[in-house]
Amino acid sequence: LDIDLFESQYIVPEGMSYNSWVILDDKVAVMDTADGRKEKEWTANLVATLNGRTPDYLICQHMEPDHSAIIGKTMQEYPALTLVCSQQTVKMLGFYFDLASFAERIMVVKEGDTLPLGTHTLNFIAAPMVHWPEVIMTYESAEKILFAADGFGKFGALCNETDDWACEARRYYFNICGKYGMQVQNVLKKASTLEINAIMPLHGPMLQGEAMAEAIRLYDLWSRYEPESDGILVAYASIHGNTAKAAHHLAEVLKQKGATKVVVSDLSRDDMAEVIEDAFRYPKL
């Protein structure tokens, strides 16, 4: 999506990707919808992917509007479609859609429930507060894929494979999920019991192989609130410029004393999301 701000607050010069997945089997499952601003494109892509078939299940892992906005119209378009979601999601649906129009076509799932599609089977994992209370993740056991909702996401639209995933994933994590370290640790413990070939997040690229292993390592590190690398963040706000001079002087003194990495951030002008990222990344503030 070609936007300059994500959630009207995070600067995203490279835009933002919103992912939705389709599993074609004896039964057809659609994994989440997308942002309402991409309704026409998403619907056209879905129709093309279905190639004449009718979806049986729409899995709602996360009720945040950038992933659920098209649920109502999709349920209307496919009268036999069943919406699969957590009980918490059911409580929220009525605030966004005419729930009465498809209330009888809702399947509530919880931790440990499974949904066979044919060759593929969906296994549901409760992931509350990563980063909304109703979130579920889904493990597909045939191809060993973890559909991770907003977990393992990143800022930016889909780019080439040489891009540094960690750079914008780090800024995304600490601003979106940073205060939910305990909840992320709980999900990682559940994931550690699974054989995973790929992680499919709702934002950013699919992760496999070494990239996936590194992403899991970083999520474990970040969610334990351990510094990722050595460094010092000097953050300041300065009305008349004197505190700014002091902050920059302090940075120079720290470098003279042997500090290998000193980052100086103006809280009034610099990207706040990057400042928060650095506050978590470095051991000294």
Range-by-range predicted roles:
Residues 1-27:
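Zn-dependent metallo-beta-lactamase
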Residues 211-285:
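N-terminal beta1-alpha1-beta2 submodule of the flavodoxin-like/Rossmannoid cofactor-binding fold
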Residues 22, 29-30, 123, 139, ...:
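Conserved beta-strand elements of the Class I
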Residues 47, 114-117, 273-280:
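Short amphipathic alpha-helix with an adjacent loop that forms part of the alpha/beta core around
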